[in-house]
Amino acid sequence: MSNFAGDETAPFFGFLGAAAALVFSCMGAAYGTAKSGVGVASMGVMRPELVMKSIVPVVMAGVLGIYGLIIAVIISTGINPKTKSYYLFDGYAHLSSGLACGLAGLSAGMAIGIVGDAGVRANAQQPKLFVGMILILIFAEALALYGLIVGIILSSRAGQSRAE
């Protein structure tokens, strides 16, 4: 028998949410960085003067991992069953928070990678496409921000299942 009030399996789901947030968002960041980085390298052969201007998708993809880190830290600081009760509701709230942020980051990373790869290659041939590429990348990044916001809201719901 455990020595804390609450459910014994609840912290498992909470930590699973923290891991999901970090793992999935970093997978999206890695995919976006790799895919758009290949496009930058390919474009750099044709137009080396545009390389620094074309690393915007790589930077935007890298930011996605930070969103997952933020949610993972918020979740993990909320899990302390020794000081206060941690119930299944809390674990599920943290799991859903991590999945919302992580899967949104994964999908945004895929979008940034594909758009960034095609965008920097097209920018080498037609510089007028740069603004359009940046706008599309911003909308893809907004997907991850939506996941971050929903993740923060869901993780703040943990602890509201009871009156203490």
From Swiss-Prot:
| UniProt cross-references to Gene3D superfamilies, sorted A to Z | lithium bound rotor ring of v- atpase
Tell me where it mainly resides.
membrane
| GO CC terms of this entry | membrane; proton-transporting V-type ATPase, V0 domain; vacuolar membrane
Instruction: Name the site position(s) for Essential for proton translocation.
Output: E141
Q: Which SUPFAM superfamilies match?
A: F1F0 ATP synthase subunit C
Name the UniProt key words of this record, in alphabetical order. Hydrogen ion transport, Ion transport, Membrane, Transmembrane, Transmembrane helix, Transport, Vacuole
Free-text function comment from the UniProt entry: Proton-conducting pore forming subunit of the membrane integral V0 complex of vacuolar ATPase. V-ATPase is responsible for acidifying a variety of intracellular compartments in eukaryotic cells.
Q: Which family does it belong to?
A: Belongs to the V-ATPase proteolipid subunit family.
For this entry, the protein name equals V-type proton ATPase 16 kDa proteolipid subunit
| The species this protein was found in | Solanum lycopersicum
